[in-house]
């Protein structure tokens, strides 16, 4: 299961574990996620008694991602989920799940194409669960991220066509930390 640190994948992980599924959470650590996302994912897994596998990925090593074309999300998602799929296969898993839900606009998100190509399954969306239903379920389950705001990756703050650098991302993260604390 691809665990982002947000409420959707957290709730999916909780449900999978509660249903008795053999599930392994994977967190892709990239330059595009602030440190708080990994912390939240690790705390969730600790609370559920599950080991979190962290995959350190350099998404900026991909020239297409650095160039930041309008379809950047496709290249980034493809890189991230290919790595998670490879790790999951090596660990003996045949399915890969993500936290996409029925409220997500899948038609205008380039990253969704990558997930489809890699045969990533989205159980929350397939079951018709909306963000509001997921939040209610996560709250009832006592998950600490039940009311966590949705968070898009740091790269979404960079205008398409403007080159993405580690320095720009670090500045964006520092600015957002100042705003949110």
Regions from the PLM with identified roles:
Residues 67-70, 154-162:
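Short glycine/proline- and acidic residue-enriched helix-loop micro-motifs
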Residues 88, 141-145, 179:
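Short, well-ordered alpha-helical segments in soluble proteins
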Residues 139-159:
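Histidine/lysine/aspartate-rich catalytic loop segments that bind and position anionic ligands
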Residues 166-181:
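Short amphipathic alpha-helix segments
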Residues 1-140:
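ATP-dependent adenylation/nucleotidyltransferase module used to activate substrates
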Residues 122-128, 144, 161-168:
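Short, surface-exposed loop/turn motifs that are enriched in glycine and acidic residues
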């Amino acid at each position: 299961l691809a665990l982002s640190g947000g409420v959707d994948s957290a709730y999916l992980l909780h449900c999978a574990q509660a249903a008795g599924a053999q599930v392994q959470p994977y967190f892709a650590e990239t330059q595009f996620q602030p440190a708080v996302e990994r912390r939240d994912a690790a705390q969730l897994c600790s609370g559920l008694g599950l080991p979190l596998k962290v995959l350190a990925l350099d998404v900026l090593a991909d020239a297409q991602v650095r160039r930041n074309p309008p379809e950047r999300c496709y290249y980034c998602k493809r890189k991230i989920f290919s790595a998670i799929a490879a790790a999951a296969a090596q660990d003996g898993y045949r399915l890969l799940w993500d936290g996409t839900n029925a409220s997500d606009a899948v038609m205008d998100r380039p990253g969704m194409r990558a997930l489809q190509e890699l045969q990533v399954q989205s159980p929350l969306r397939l079951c018709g669960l909306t963000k509001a239903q997921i939040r209610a379920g996560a709250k009832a389950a006592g998950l600490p991220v039940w009311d966590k705001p949705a968070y898009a990756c740091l790269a979404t703050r960079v205008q398409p066509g403007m080159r993405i650098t580690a320095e720009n991302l670090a500045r964006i993260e520092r600015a957002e930390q100042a705003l949110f604390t």
